[in-house]
UniProtKB/Swiss-Prot annotation:
Disulphide bridges, residue numbers: C1-C14, C2-C10, C6-C13
Organism whose genome encodes this protein: Conus inscriptus
Protein name (record): Conotoxin In1746
Modified residues (Tyrosine amide): Y15
Record text about domains: The cysteine framework is III (CC-C-C-CC).
Subcellular location: Secreted
The keyword Zinc appears for this protein: no
Role this protein plays: Probable neurotoxin with unknown target. Possibly targets ion channels. In vivo, intraperitoneal injection into fish provokes paralysis after 5 minutes.
Length: 15
């Protein structure tokens, strides 16, 4: 999965 804002546990989608 992908989450915004980024947290530990999911793929960081902050690009």
């Amino acid at each position: 999965c992908c989450e915004w804002p980024c947290h530990h546990g999911c793929i960081p989608c902050c690009y």
